[in-house]
From Swiss-Prot:
Domain of life: Eukaryota
Organism encoding this protein: Xenopus laevis (African clawed frog)
UniProt-recorded name of the protein: E3 ubiquitin-protein ligase RNF138
Pfam family of the protein (one): zf-C3HC4_2
Binding of Zn(2+), residues: 85, 88, 100, 104
Residue stretches making up the UIM domain: 202-220
């Protein structure tokens, strides 16, 4: 395998996604035209553009539109090769480059990004608080909010089927901190695509939530 690269300019042609024009993340390959994209970019293109390759408009069959084939050769190279962030110059494995952007201050300054607080609605009151932070159940990555946790797990661990405790469920009042789920990544995607805090007060238990819902429905019916 080639030795570690010194800067991102040497790898842009092979490891850049044609859609987002950034380093590939969870690379997938079309089966007919063999073009490679970030999995997320490809799935978004399928939802908006139909059954065509986002680059050449070649045909994409039904099965790969919902379950694209991972470009394991590209993924392996990215796990072996290193490069420098084009914004801050920090060296790392290419596989982790796009994840690095989430914490790269210069990248966030370039695109005008900044951390946001979440507003929690509790009856007629609303308060500002910091989003809860989670640790990835499959690796040492930590200090992730819910959205970042899902993105990290889908980008780094999507094809791993591991029985683990869900880190989000474990923090909820009605959750069981020792109950495991057979495929924690599939569970996260099925149960945690939205943030409970945006719809309810997570500091009260499930029975109290039910009573509030009944009371509110009674007010509406009157």
């Amino acid at each position: 395998m080639a030795e570690a690269m010194s800067c991102s300019s040497e790898i842009t042609e092979e490891f850049l996604c044609p859609v987002c024009q950034e380093i590939l993340q969870t690379p997938v390959r079309t089966q007919t035209c063999r073009h490679v994209f970030c999995r997320k970019c490809f799935m978004l293109a399928m939802k908006s553009g139909g059954a065509y390759c986002p680059l050449c408009r070649g045909p994409v069959n039904k099965s790969e539109r919902s379950a694209p084939v991972r470009a394991t050769d590209i993924d392996l190279e990215m796990r072996m090769l290193s490069g420098g962030c084009m914004y801050c110059g920090k060296m790392m494995k290419l596989h982790y480059m796009k994840l690095h952007y989430k914490s790269c201050r210069k990248y966030q300054e370039e695109y005008g990004l900044s951390p946001k607080n979440v507003t929690i609605q509790t009856g007629q009151n609303s308060t500002k608080c910091q989003e809860p932070k989670y640790k990835c159940p499959l690796c040492s990555e930590h200090n992730l909010n819910q959205r970042s946790l899902l993105e990290h797990c889908n980008n780094v661990h999507y094809y791993e089927e591991v029985e683990m405790v869900c880190p989000i469920c474990a923090t909820l009042p009605w959750g069981d901190p020792i109950q495991t789920t057979g495929n924690v990544i599939a569970h996260l995607n099925a149960r945690h695509q939205f943030n409970y805090q945006e719809f309810m007060n997570i500091n009260i238990d499930e029975e109290a939530q039910f009573q509030i819902a009944v009371a509110n429905s009674y007010k509406i019916s009157r």
